Amino acid sequence: MNISPTPKRYNSRGDRYYASQARGKVPEFEPYRKSGLNFNDGYSGINPPVYKNGLHSNLDDDKLVPEEIKLQRTVINDLISQNKELQTTVHTQREEIERLNIIIGQFRAKLTKYSVMNRKLEDELRGSERSSNALNKDRNDDRNDSILENSFENAEDYIQIPKLRYNSKGKQDKSPQTNDLNDRLSQLVQLLEKSQQNNSTKINSNSNDMSPPVCSSATPPERNNKPIMSSPKIRDPSEEDILCQESAELKSLENQIELVKKKLLIKRENELRKLSLENELIELMDQLSTDASPYRYGKSKGNFISTSKHEKHDENLSDIYGDYTGKNSLRKHNIKPFNPIKMDNILETPTPPNRRNSE
């Protein structure tokens, strides 16, 4: 059986209408039936055609539409376009703000990283400066010791000259010049011996702080074969060293102050917490006492009797008849006085008075 569509389905007028409507063009043709109801008429009121954006394509050219509606349409379109533009600008600004926030976070992380690195490097620099100062001090001490050791004159370094012994029989020629020279030499030898003794005593007493001995310029050139080096002076602390030391002391003081402040804050918080807990405990104890006092148990009626009424009645009777009538009134009503709760055993389960009496 052939199920292929008939040619009428392809060539029908309705198919042409819907195909042209999909393309955006509505063909003008007569209605399907010649009646008063035209379904393809835009102003018939029954099933009007639906156009793009719910409006007629030729609304501006239509004469039946008033001009106010046309103006409103243009204004609304302008507002919609402006709203879209503003939304796009807001969206772009938000994206820029997010991007800037990301950049700020990266810079903050880098700042913290480099600050930590800077602190570590400063600590290392201070440690290296201390070690270098200690090494320089040790070197200076060693150099001073070596200079002092070299400055002492050994007996082996001198040229031993035999003394001239004059015969008693021979003639001794003594001139005043030779006598003066001999006296000067003897004085110089004595001075050198004294200086060597003083230096030896100083070395034994203070081995760390040594200064080279002052050599006299009047010594003979034969004995001063070795040049005496002057001891290097110890370097004085510079302004940078003083500032670094002061900054370190200030930082240590600031850290101590912060620790003391933290301890004081913790102490105050603990005191306030203690006071608040004590107040809560007092309030809870008052609530327990008030919850237990307003009711008493009566044997005659077998139910709870409020104590406030009886207390008022007893007060009135005591005013009239005295304390004796108040006690008798309690006996007449068979009401036992309330036993106060002991505060030692607050957490125990309460037992009714009937069971207590039975026990």
UniProtKB/Swiss-Prot annotation:
It comes from the Eukaryota. Residues 195-219 have a biased composition (Polar residues). Forms a polymeric layer at the periphery of the spindle pole body (SPB) central plaque which has an essential function during SPB duplication and may facilitate attachment of the SPB to the nuclear membrane. GO terms for cellular component: cytoplasm; nucleus; spindle pole body. Residues 123-145, 195-238 are annotated as: Disordered. Keywords: Coiled coil, Cytoplasm, Cytoskeleton, Nucleus. Its main location: nucleus. Residues 67-289 form a coiled coil. Residues 136-145 have a biased composition (Basic and acidic residues). It is found in: Nucleus; Cytoplasm, Cytoskeleton, Microtubule organizing center, Spindle pole body. Belongs to the SPC42 family. This is Spindle pole body component SPC42. InterPro entries: Spc42 (IPR021611). The keyword Coiled coil applies.
